[in-house]
Amino acid sequence: ILGERYSQCDKMNRTGIAIVARDKGVRHGITLRNLSIHHVEGNVYDKHMNNGGIYATALRPTSEETNDVPRFQDMTIEGCFVYQVSRWGIAVGYTYAHAEFQGAELAEASFRKYGHENLVIRDNYVKAAGGDGITAMYALRPLIEHNMADSVAGEINDRIYAEPGGKMGKVAAGIWPWKCKDALFRYNEVADTRLNQDGMAYDADSGDGTIYEYNYSRQNEGGCVMFCLQEAIHNTFRNNVSYDDLGGIISPSENPDALLQDNIFYVRKGVPFVRKNMDGGAFTEVNNQIIGIEE
């Protein structure tokens, strides 16, 4: 658009592939496979609408009285390369019915009526996303596996995120869920996430029963993992390896009950295990190894 500044607040949202459910109820069997999506200059401030590489949304139907609830079932995104996009790398999927997912304990019935089911995100490579790498939202038992998020959150800084106009959201992380139930993240890798108020590889955020297992992280400027606030419950982080993550390895962030078990943390001298100003939560450690990195 002529005269549009890269960082302006009302910049047009742009998406490599936008998937939108609205007036036809449940959308079944959508598969995106082996796609290359790159150089999408979206709006770095907009976290909730189609904006970035691949983004799926369920929007309010034209008539809620006559249309079924729009949502997704049996969606798979696999084998895609998403490079230099803003804001998101891959996200599935924001819903207009977000008010149905309030509180910490999330009822399975809410997902079967308003949320997404049988979501699989696997074997994707997201590099240099301006904001977050890969996120599952409002999904029941999503599977996120064998993905790579490399050098994401590169625009969540004062230089580019400079004209928010009162919008919140100057935070981003690597691979994480939002308001999911029993999400499973395994065999993923996150490297070189740029520092911001978050900036960690993994973030169990406002969900119920998130499991991270057999994942790897290295040199993420905001640390390895965050358990985000009081509405993220029943989180388990097990059998993962963190190598030279920075800033502070874990961020319990007022979380009530995180479990860290059978992980290996390779830690540089001077890097705290708990990130400063991201503490205050309760967590249990079982059989973890903390190994110093030789200079």
Feature locations, PLM:
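Carbohydrate-interacting regions of secretory-pathway proteins
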Residues: 16-17, 52-55, 91-92, 98, ...
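Right-handed parallel beta-helix
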Residues: 28-41, 65-88, 100-132, 140-165, ...
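Extracellular beta-strand solenoids
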Residues: 19, 37, 56, 92, ...
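Residue-level marker of regulatory loop/turn positions in helix-turn-helix DNA-binding domains and
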Residues: 9, 24, 46, 69, ...
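Extracellular beta-strand-rich solenoid/capping regions of secreted or surface-exposed proteins
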Residues: 3-31, 43-70
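Short, contiguous acidic/charged loop-to-helix segments that flank catalytic cores in large enzymes
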Residues: 226-230, 247-255, 274-280
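Glycine-centered small-residue motifs that form tight turns
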Residues: 48-54, 170-172, 199
